[in-house]
């Protein structure tokens, strides 16, 4: 790519980009697209992709949760379902969430926001949305308030709330809105996302063997889908 220059007429108006795409998608793109010490090859299509894939996916995941939580009047008032009594799918995503907390905390402490943002993005798109919500959606449909359904609500709520806190240094406006919308009903926190304590990983919830087994299942599934597309079946 060429260096932006008024003389060459290839400069991008930042205010126009913010107006059209939003400041948080722009900030997320610039931070996750390249390391701070590397040159950034700016592409407006990349900002649009971040807005659609990451922020759009996170919004859709929250909207899915909010739809059924409102129907069932879920307010996180019930006692926590014990971790070891939750289904394996819940224990898997919570294990990944706590592994994510460790990785993101370490990245921020080492002034590596690029690594932090990429880890969060991968968790939201690949694991939380593509796998956890897709495999768990039927659990929210039933009319009865079972322990399994409560576990599903508590698990997804915890993931969304934690992601909003982890992401807030990079996307302060969007994540504060997400955090506020979540807590508007539950009242778990009375302040905004930027004043809460940063999450601390619960080592007892991290199960690397479970993460590896699920990762293998994801790879096998992706390979099978790829073969099906190849032979058009």
Question: What residues fall within each predicted segment?
Answer:
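Acidic, turn-prone loop/beta-hairpin segments
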Residues: 72-102, 134-223, 231
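Short helix-adjacent coil turns
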Residues: 108-115
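Catalytic adenosine-cofactor/nucleotide-binding cores of aminoacyl-tRNA synthetases and other
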Residues: 2-84, 186-189, 229-233
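Generic beta-strand/beta-sheet core signal
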Residues: 2, 6-7, 29-31, 43, ...
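Membrane-interfacial loop-to-helix junctions in multi-pass inner-membrane proteins
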Residues: 46-52, 112, 148-156
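Long hydrophobic segments that form regular secondary structure
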Residues: 98, 112, 120, 227-230
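Core structural elements
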Residues: 31-33, 53-66, 87-100, 117-140, ...
């Amino acid at each position: 790519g060429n260096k932006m220059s008024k003389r060459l007429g290839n400069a991008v108006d930042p205010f126009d980009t913010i107006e059209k795409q939003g400041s948080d998608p722009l900030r997320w793109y610039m931070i996750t697209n390249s390391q701070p010490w590397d040159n950034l090859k700016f592409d407006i299509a990349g900002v649009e992709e971040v807005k659609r894939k990451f922020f759009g996916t996170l919004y859709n995941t929250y909207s899915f949760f909010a739809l059924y939580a409102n129907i069932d009047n879920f307010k996180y008032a019930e006692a926590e379902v014990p971790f070891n009594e939750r289904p394996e799918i819940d224990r898997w995503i919570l294990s990944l969430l706590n592994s994510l907390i460790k990785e993101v905390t370490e990245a921020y402490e080492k002034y590596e926001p690029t690594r932090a943002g990429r880890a969060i993005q991968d968790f939201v798109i690949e694991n939380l949305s593509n796998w956890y919500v897709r495999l768990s959606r039927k659990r929210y449909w039933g009319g009865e308030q079972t322990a399994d359904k409560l576990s599903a609500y508590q698990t997804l709520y915890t993931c969304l709330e934690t992601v909003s806190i982890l992401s807030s240094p990079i996307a302060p406006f969007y994540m504060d809105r997400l955090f506020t919308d979540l807590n508007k009903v539950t009242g778990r926190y009375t302040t905004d996302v930027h004043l809460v304590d940063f999450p601390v990983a619960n080592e007892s919830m991290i199960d690397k063997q479970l993460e590896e087994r699920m990762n293998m299942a994801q790879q096998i599934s992706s390979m099978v889908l790829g073969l099906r597309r190849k032979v058009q079946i």
